[in-house]
């Protein structure tokens, strides 16, 4: 008996706490007293929401609202709901076409659960730092979406079925207005919703409605319920307004549709077209903001979701009406016979300057001059005189009566877009990402634009690829060995562009000068009324002024301006430098590896070489005969940029005057801890277009050949001097 009692006590000792724990778990999962049921049940209990619930039933959303899945419900009462139906010609819920009813009812149900604090200041990454961009993430995905739409493909004229995505519902909180430092909160809200009630600060407004007293964030079994004072009108997307025949934006639409990308979607076709064997498409626009989508995030970058972009990014549309846009096209594009002839690239800059993807832009910001377009131009239109002002599911729409001219149309790149004969160079600048850089208002540029035939003369052509897809173009050059065209590399394209862009203004082409291009250690020469590249030539490429702009000047060049492809040893082994090179060989300062001649002492560094002429060497009486002394003697004619920590060669008008370390070692002043090098003085004589050289003590001097450019190579430049008597003391 004692043993049995002991066993019972032990069992109670071990399992008693577990029984108590089970009671606690049951309490944890008990329905909280403060939950009042599903949103559907709560609305049923209130009595005056029967019309809204009837719409929910008919539209097929009862299962969601009644507890299956997280959702946030915004409910208008019977009076408000019927007022909306009557205003749209429906006498009862049963009279509303099912597709329209699904959109309307679904527009009141937001996916996922949002408590009041979330709607005031939604933070996609949680509430770790609620002060970050308060109110910016302002729109939320609903269950409302338009039915599959039959549209005409603007490229083919064929009828197709296009899938429409779920609409987003804007929730504008006064936190957003304060974050943007707006003074008149009511003005910014009622600008888009003039017939809605303003209920003051510290509120959020659900599109055209506000929350009524006692209806703010009622907890439900599967989310939250908000009682609102107005029926939420389903919002259009930006493209819906553009294609609305009652509005005046048909020109903008026709240009935008030049970029139409209507893509077959196998998954959507299987899901929505299975019964009718129909093909379902999605309607986007290549290279431009996807204003035909209800969403501002459309799986870009291969991601399936991006809440920050979906909730916080708006397509801010500043769309010019037909009269304004037609007038601009006629004035700016006189070289093109019709709108269809204008290149896609020009249209991309024009159109994207009117659709800014950013956080939502509100009217007071525009008034205050705080808003710029995609390319940094001022949004200088009168917001109170817009043709259309509308909050959309994917942004905001301002219908304006002027064109916001993009920066590339007003700066040194302007002629590219106005003249068809510059099409290749326009595309070249685009491919290399230079067009936007050339709009920088803080710089002065000189831009040389070759005509298309100049490219063709050099065996370069533009392969258009798919003419409907901007960016599919490829530059190709002729391979003279087999007569075939091969695609040019990114480096080749970059080098070609650089030789036509000088980061300063050039106005005098008769004075002999040299200018650095936008690429490090590449240069153009100016003389004889024109320009030349780095190759050795006595003939200048003639230029024709095209215009002077706020950030520089633009010229047409009759030929391409070329970059040298020679290296130092290619030039030094020429007859012109034969005596100097013979001394280099005698001193052992060269090496041949697999047929390639190199100068090992340069070790890949970039050098300025001051080579005595053949006549100077013949006349010299100071050339050492022993090898070691000859090495010291010859190295004094070499100055590398890297050892002197400078970024530019010294040329007339370029670089800094002063003493430069050569490669010649000053043995007397060197030790095992530090090696000293003899210095050579370099001083510009711009008037005579030459350099003056002095030895380390300034006791000897000589000049480079007057009026003669150095020889440019990819790894240095070579000046000729008329004496060897410049050695250090």
Regions found by a protein language model. Give the residues of each.
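Sec-dependent bacterial lipoprotein signal peptides
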Residues: 1-21
């Amino acid at each position: 008996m004692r043993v049995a009692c002991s066993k019972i006590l032990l069992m109670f000792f071990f399992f008693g706490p577990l029984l108590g724990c089970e009671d606690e778990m049951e309490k944890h999962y008990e329905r909280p007293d403060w939950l009042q049921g599903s949103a559907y049940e709560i609305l049923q209990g209130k009595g005056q929401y029967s019309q809204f619930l009837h719409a929910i039933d008919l539209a097929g959303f009862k299962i969601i609202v009644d507890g299956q899945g997280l959702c946030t419900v915004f409910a208008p009462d019977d009076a408000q709901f019927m007022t909306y139906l009557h205003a749209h010609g429906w006498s009862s819920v049963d009279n509303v076409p099912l597709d329209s009813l699904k959109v309307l009812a679904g527009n009141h149900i937001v996916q996922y659960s949002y408590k009041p604090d979330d709607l005031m200041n939604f933070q996609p990454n949680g509430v770790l730092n609620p002060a970050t961009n308060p109110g910016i993430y302002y729109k939320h995905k609903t269950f409302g979406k338009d039915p599959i739409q039959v549209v005409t493909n603007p490229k083919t004229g064929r009828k197709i079925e296009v899938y429409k995505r779920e609409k987003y519902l804007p929730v504008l909180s006064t936190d957003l207005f304060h974050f943007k430092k707006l003074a008149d909160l009511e003005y910014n809200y009622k600008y888009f919703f003039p017939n809605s009630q303003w209920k003051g600060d510290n509120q959020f407004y659900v599109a055209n409605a506000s929350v009524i007293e006692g209806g703010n964030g009622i907890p439900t079994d599967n989310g939250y319920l908000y009682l609102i004072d107005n029926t939420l009108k389903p919002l259009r997307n930006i493209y819906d307004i553009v294609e609305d025949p009652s509005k005046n934006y048909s020109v903008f639409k026709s240009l935008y549709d030049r970029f139409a990308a209507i893509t077959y979607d196998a998954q959507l076709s299987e899901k929505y077209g299975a019964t009718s064997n129909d093909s379902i498409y999605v309607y986007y626009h290549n290279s431009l903001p996807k204003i035909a989508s209800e969403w501002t995030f459309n799986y870009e970058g291969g991601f399936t979701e991006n809440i920050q972009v979906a909730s916080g990014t708006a397509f801010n549309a500043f769309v010019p009406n037909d009269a304004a846009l037609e007038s601009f096209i006629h004035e700016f594009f006189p070289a093109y016979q019709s709108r269809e002839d204008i290149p896609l690239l020009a249209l991309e800059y024009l159109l994207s300057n009117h659709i800014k993807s950013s956080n939502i832009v509100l009217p007071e910001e525009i008034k205050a001059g705080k808003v710029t377009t995609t390319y940094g131009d001022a949004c200088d239109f009168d917001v109170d005189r817009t043709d259309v002002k509308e909050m959309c599911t994917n942004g905001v729409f301002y219908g304006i009566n002027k064109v916001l001219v993009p920066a590339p149309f007003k700066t040194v790149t302007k002629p590219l877009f106005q003249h068809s004969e510059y099409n290749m160079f326009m595309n070249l600048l685009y491919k290399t990402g230079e067009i936007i850089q050339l709009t920088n208002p803080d710089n002065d540029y000189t831009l040389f634009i070759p005509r298309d035939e100049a490219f063709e003369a050099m065996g370069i052509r533009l392969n258009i690829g798919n003419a409907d897809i901007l960016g599919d173009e490829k530059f190709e050059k002729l391979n003279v060995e087999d007569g075939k065209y091969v695609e040019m590399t990114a480096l080749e394209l970059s080098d070609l562009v650089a030789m036509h862009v000088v980061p300063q203004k050039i106005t005098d082409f008769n004075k002999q000068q040299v200018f650095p291009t936008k690429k490090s250690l590449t240069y153009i020469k100016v003389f004889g009324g024109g320009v030349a590249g780095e190759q050795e030539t006595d003939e200048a490429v003639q230029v024709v002024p095209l215009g002077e702009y706020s950030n520089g000047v633009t010229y047409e060049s009759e030929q391409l301006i070329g970059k040298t492809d020679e290296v130092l040893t290619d030039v030094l082994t020429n007859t012109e430098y034969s005596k100097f090179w013979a001394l280099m060989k005698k001193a052992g300062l060269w090496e041949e590896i697999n047929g390639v001649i190199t100068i090992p002492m340069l070790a890949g560094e970039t050098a300025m070489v001051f080579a005595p002429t053949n006549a100077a060497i013949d006349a010299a009486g100071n050339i050492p005969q022993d090898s070691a002394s000859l090495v010291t003697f010859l190295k004094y004619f070499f100055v590398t940029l890297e050892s002197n920590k400078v970024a530019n060669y010294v040329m007339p008008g370029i670089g800094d005057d002063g003493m430069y370390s050569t490669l010649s070692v000053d043995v007397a002043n060197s030790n095992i801890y530090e090696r000293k090098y003899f210095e050579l003085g370099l001083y510009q004589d711009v008037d005579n277009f030459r350099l003056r050289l002095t030895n380390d003590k300034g006791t000897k001097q000589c000049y480079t050949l007057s009026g003669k450019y150095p020889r440019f190579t990819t790894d240095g430049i070579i000046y000729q001097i008329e004496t060897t008597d410049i050695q250090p003391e």
